[in-house]
Amino acid sequence: MEKSMRIKVRLLLVLITALEKVPVLVKLFLRPIANAPVISGKMKVLIRAYMGATAFDIHDVDLRNGRIGIGGVEEIMAGSIIIKLLHEILAEKMGEEKKNKALYEIGINLCKWEVSQSLGQGRWAPRVLVPLIVNSKIIDEVQSDPLMARFFKKTMNMVSRLITDEGGWGHLDFDFSSMPLKVTLVNSQEARWLPGSRKPVCHFYAGIVAGYASAISGEDLEVKEVACKSMGTPNCVFHITRKSGSRQI
């Protein structure tokens, strides 16, 4: 990483860490600013989030046209039982193995689309942050550079808070020091709706992790669920690896 970029990363880490230490200050003073009618429309999603705004604060609601989105990424809302219905109906129509592959591919394509939309709209992160978050060296950098690993983890924690935690999917925790890279999902919706399984069931969410990791790195990465709450483990754990024939993570 270039020296100038390392300086920016250090400054951002200092600022983010300082805000994390004063949650009351953030809630009482910064969140009202982040949600102010005129100012909020000109601020990036991640900036507002670090200032205490929630996903519910940041969502754009178009009542006239019946649309909702966040940072230019259009969304729809549905009951969480849709996860169970997708598993059951696709299994009935396709069989278990093809269903699992289909859900994984849906997750990949969904998340790749969301990343492309968020970057294309330019509303999620300041331009100075985009090369730090989305680049072809990111996988190697987070494993070889402790500074970059700290920064990326904090950034991913915030993105996860907005999308996963406040979106009702559960809670993600990232371990960039492990080999391979490890992602832990607490309170998985798939595991909740499909309890008592002998095999991992979170194929859709594995695809989501793979889609996001592939989109920000520019690589085709694979994700495998190695522990699943549906099987009785405390949480669901995913490993991120490069496809066979390429460099391993």
What are these regions (language model features)?
Residues 1-182, 188-203, 229-235, 241-249:
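N-terminal accessory segment detector
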